[in-house]
């Protein structure tokens, strides 16, 4: 039998209070709040959402999409194309261990937060590089095909869609 390592807020009132607190934190203008870098704030937001665990299912997916939406909303990326899912999946046990370390110390250990934030920053960096490479691998053949077929390709695409 698996050991329960964390019990998230249980009652509707607890969850609602935590979500309101998180929503307020997300919407506070960072420059008004303190000198908190938006990427560090993103790591804190993600941890807090995962700890609130407001849904029966889908918290992980929702937490990851929340990261992407935060990046877009804060003009850190133009389009919602940066997904941390692969990074988190490949580093799943470290991801959960780091989240749990913060919970175990009730968020009071600065080193736990530092390790978590560095993990998330590394994930953002790695995912960004992979995304740029993927776009380049799509763009180069597309441009080559476009040059080869020119307007005929554009007309064919327009007629088929």
Feature map (PLM): residue ranges:
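FIC/Doc superfamily catalytic core
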Residues: 1-161
């Amino acid at each position: 039998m698996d050991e329960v390592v964390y019990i998230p807020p249980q009652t509707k009132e607890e969850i609602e209070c935590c979500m309101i607190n998180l929503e307020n934190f997300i919407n506070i203008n960072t420059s008004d709040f303190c000198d908190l870098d938006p990427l560090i704030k993103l790591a804190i937001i993600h941890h807090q959402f995962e700890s609130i665990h407001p849904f029966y299912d889908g918290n992980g997916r929702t937490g990851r999409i929340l990261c992407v939406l935060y990046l877009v909303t804060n003009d850190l990326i133009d389009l919602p194309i940066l997904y941390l899912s692969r990074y988190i999946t490949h580093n799943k046990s470290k991801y959960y261990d780091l989240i749990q370390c913060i919970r175990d110390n009730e968020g009071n250990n600065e080193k736990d937060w530092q390790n978590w934030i560095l993990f998330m920053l590394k994930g953002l960096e790695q995912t960004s590089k992979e995304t740029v490479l993927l776009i380049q691998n799509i763009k180069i053949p597309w441009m080559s095909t476009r040059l080869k077929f020119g307007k005929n390709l554009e007309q064919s695409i327009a007629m088929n869609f």
